[in-house]
Amino acid sequence: MNLTEQLVELAEQIESSDPIDWGMLSINEHDAYMLIAGSVLDSYLGTEPDSRDMILLATVVKLTVENFVLNLKLMQK
């Protein structure tokens, strides 16, 4: 199993505790995970090792805030 597949497997396991509603999307769930995991891994490996942790943490913060805002918008509907 390559690193992208390992990332996808772990992410899919994490999703099982907080499932995403894929019903209204026209992309296969596993394909979406593979696409994004490959992109994230490419970005990670293309970053200087001494900068990786800070960039990774900043990215997690940005995505968490984005998810928070999207969830608030959905709850207002």
Label the predicted regions.
Residues 2-35:
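N-terminal acidic leader/helix
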Residues 15, 19-22, 48, 68, ...:
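Residue-level signal for secondary-structure boundary elements
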Residues 16, 38, 42, 62-70:
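Extended, non-membrane alpha-helical segments enriched in charged/polar residues
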